[in-house]
Amino acid sequence: MNIVVLTLHNPFDFDFNNWLSNKEHNIFLFLDKHSITCSETEFYNYSQNFKKVMHFDNYINNGLIEYEILQIHNDFKVDCIMSFGEDDILRASRLRKKLNIFGAEEKFEIYFRDKVKMKEHAVNCNIATPKFSALNTPLDLINFYQEINAPIFVKPRSASGSVFTKKISNEEDLKACLSQNFAARIPFSEYYSDSMVEEYIDAEMYHIDGLIVDSELMVAWPSKYLSKNLDLTSIQNQLSVGSAMLDNNNPLTEPLLNFAKKIIKNFPFYKHSTFHIEVFVTSSHDIKLCEVAARTGGGKINLMFKAAFGCDLNKLLFNLHLAAAKNDACEIKNIKSELACLKEPKNFAGFFLINPICGTFLSGAQNCKFEFVADYRLTAKAGQKFNGREYSGDNMGYAVCVGSNEQILNNNIRQTVDWVYSNIRYE
C-alpha cells in the first residue's frame, strides 16, 4: 500500500516506520521544514526509512504539498491519506475527495477546524458554550464588547496552540485590537474574516482525551491544565505549562466524561478518531465547551496517555487507518478488544513543557532519576538562543510524571518542575 502522511509537528514524535508490521508498505511523509529539530545527518538517516520525505516552508498554506501528492498518486496510486494534527484535517479531506480515497470528509471536518462553525453546532446541540461571534468587520468586535463588556477573548477561527489569542480587559485593549487585528492578507484589499470573539470565562480549564473506534467511544479520561487559561500572554513566562489527570475520587471526573460523551454523540467524528476536548469549569462546577478537536491533544498529551493507559493513541490511529484502507475488519476488532479493558488509567499521569526562557541556553540536566518520571527530555543545545514561549506548545523539553492518585501526581510534577529549573543555566 502507498500511504501519505501529513504532519506539521516534529516527525520524531511519531514512530511511523516501526508502526508498520508489513514493510512492503510505502510511506510518503510530508513535513513542516521548521518542525525538524535534528541535524542534517540525523534527518537523512531518518528519511531512509520512507519511500519519500518532503519538507516545506509555509507548510499550512503551501499548495506544492497538494501538487506533489497528486504527482505521487499518478506514479504510485495513493491508497491512504493520514493527517496527524489539526492543521492538516481539511487538506487531507480535500485530497481524499479528489483521489476518491476513504476517510473523513471536509463537510464534517470543518466543524473541528472552524471554531465559529464548531460553536454554532454546539449551540444547536444544546451544549453549554460561551457567547461568541465571528469577526467579519471591526463593528462586530465593537458590538460584542458593548453587549458583553470586558473581559472578552479574541482568537483565530482556525489556528491552534494559542497563537494570536488576545484577552481584551478594557477600552484601551479594545482600541489596540481594532487597530491591529483587522489587517488584510493582501495590501489594499478588504479584511477577510479569520478571527472570532467570545466572552472570557473566569474558570479553570480541563481537557478530555481518548479514542473512538468504529464510531464507539473506547477510552477517555479527563485532565486539568496546570495553567488557568491558554491566553498566550498569560502563559509565556509560566514555568509549568502542561496538565495532570484527575483521579477517580475527583467529583469532576464523571461529569467531565459525561460531557465528552455528549460532545462525541453530537459532533460528526470520523468512525476512527482520536479526540481532544477542552472545557471551562466554573467555581460552581458548571462545564462549558472551549473547543473540540478530532485529533490527538498537543503538548505531550499522547505521552501522558501512554504512561497512564499503556497505549499510544497516535499508533492506534495509524493502525486503524491502515486496517480501514485494507478492509481488515479482523485488525479493527483486535484493536477494539485491546482497548476494551482500558476503562481506567493504570497510573495517573501528567506532563509539563520546559519553558524556552528568553536568552542563551548554557546547560541543563540531561537525565532524570526520579522513579515517578516516566519520560524526560531536554532538547535545548548549549549556545541555543530562545525568545520565550511563542505558542502554547512551545518548549525546550518536557517531563512526564506518574502517581498513584491525583495529589501524589501533582506533588511529583511540582518536585520535577523545581528540579528541572534549578539545573538550567542560561544568560
Predicted regions and their residues:
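Peripheral (often C-terminal) accessory segments that flank ATP-dependent C-N-forming ligase machineries
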Residues: 4, 124, 318-427
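Short internal beta-strands
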Residues: 27-34
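Conserved metal-phosphate-binding beta-hairpin within the catalytic cores
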Residues: 210, 247, 264-305, 329-336, ...
